Amino acid sequence: MKPLIATSLVSPQRAGPGLAMPSLSLVACALMVLVAAGTALVNSYYLLLMTFAAIYMVAAMGLNLLTGYAGIVSIAHGALVCVGTYATAIASVRYGWGFWPSAVLSASVGLGFSVVLGLPALRLSSWYFVLITIAFTLAVTAMLNDLRGFTGGYGGIVGIPKPSLAGVRFDGFGLFALVGGVAALLWWVMHNLIDSRIGWALQSIREGDVRARANGVSTARLRLFAFAFSGAVAGLAGAFYASAKGVVTPEDFSFDFSIFFLFVVVLGGPARLSGPMLGVAAFYVLPELLDSLKEYRMIAYGVGLLAFSVFLPEGLAGAIARFDDRRQARRATSPAATLPRDAGAATVEPVRGMALAIRGLAKDFGGVRALDGVSLDVQPGSIHAIVGPNGSGKTTLLNMISGFYPASAGSILLDGAEVVGRGPTSIARLGVQRTFQTPKLLGELSLLENVRFGAYARERSSGLEIAFRLPRARHEAAALDAEALRLLALVGLAGRAHEHAALLPHGQQRLVEIARALIGRPKLLLLDEPAAGLSMGELDELGDLMRTIRRMGTTLIMVEHHIELVASIANTVTVLDQGRILAEGTPEQVFSSAAVVHAYTGGAR
């Protein structure tokens, strides 16, 4: 049952995360399950076809986590299915292992190969990694013949047993039902992972890891997790492939076998839970059922791929989701409300503000000195504003405090602890949160999910607890959902909690980003131009919000151009000009300084 595939690749646009499957996708998938079960009962050919379709769907779900959600393109997935297949074949036929121990071995082998394969991805660019996966796939294909003492060479391995449990042998429809049950269980696990801090962090890494690292995510560990999960699932699918086929040969695992899985994910709908099922149905089951039109099948397949690249860049699942979103929007009777800001909504525990001391800080970019000997002190629980002309080094200073830029010279002390040399993940876990000049939200997550993601470093549930929704994970998620909703009420957006963040105007996206930072219970909050793009009314609300955050105990450092806002809320103002401190003091002292006025108006210092 080798799938028919094409030999060209369509690069999709980013798809939505599919955290809650849209209703039309749910209906489509439910219908396909019923059709598959009914078709499998027709005759042995259709039964075998549907069994392999379920196996391919299991394998594709693993690749969907890696490529769809984490954004790491791999051509090696078919090769990992291959090593899992041969692990079960060799263990069961040559060493007499039962199916279940062999399946565990296959999953372990797939996991091990995938992690080793993924290590270079932590340092290489995406396209270099694609080349490595291609080389790995070709190497595995070559070794199937070269290591014929283990693999049987061109003759392959025959007599692979079927699974059995408690004396019941799974064959025919029983094997189809078993694989279908495994696919359903894996879908549930995937749903739980994606609808959690793990899934949100993976999508954040896919969009660029700045946001993820600012939230305390260890991006390297999470990428390795994606590789490990994907490889283990591929190996497990290989075990079922070996058992269903009964005989495995190198011809089953040509290079296009790996390309097939990438097509299933990309064209079925990357980062959509329903994508693998739709992809397998469209690009494996349908071509097999059209075998009578074999003469024209490749033409139709090529035309179909071209049509997908032009008209359905988000894949089948993405197209269904978009249509469903529009349908539901037309049925909505009223727009979502933007509620007044509730200053008493955030009943989080007070925090102890963090003290910051900077001494002789300098930053060089090539031959340009962006910061030159900056020294300042920020008192715990205060609002400290950093102002100055464009290009004076304000954002550079925030990037150095938060660990995104290494210091060329000088010292940064947070509560007396030196943090120069630490990365953003480590500093975030000390209690430092930040926002950015351009809001960095995950556009197709809801506002609630975006805020929840800010609690990444606070959560204590393990990945296993999240995957199987064990009690601690459920209770922690419920508590954080409630806290996120309170913080959205604090910024006046509780009425839009379940809308996609991409639908918000720029100013409200900034407020969501502040709420996301607050759920991490920061001791120090860095705000980069929070007033940019806000109306006068929104500026007043932002000022009230800053005062509320200060009352919680959090220390705020704010880079801002809006002088009136700074003058109304800041305890201390530091003025930077050409990378050096020009003035420091209360807002009244600073903004009445002739040197500051000259710096802003372009006069000589």
Describe each region flagged by the PLM.
Residues 402:
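Helix-to-loop junction immediately C-terminal to a conserved catalytic motif
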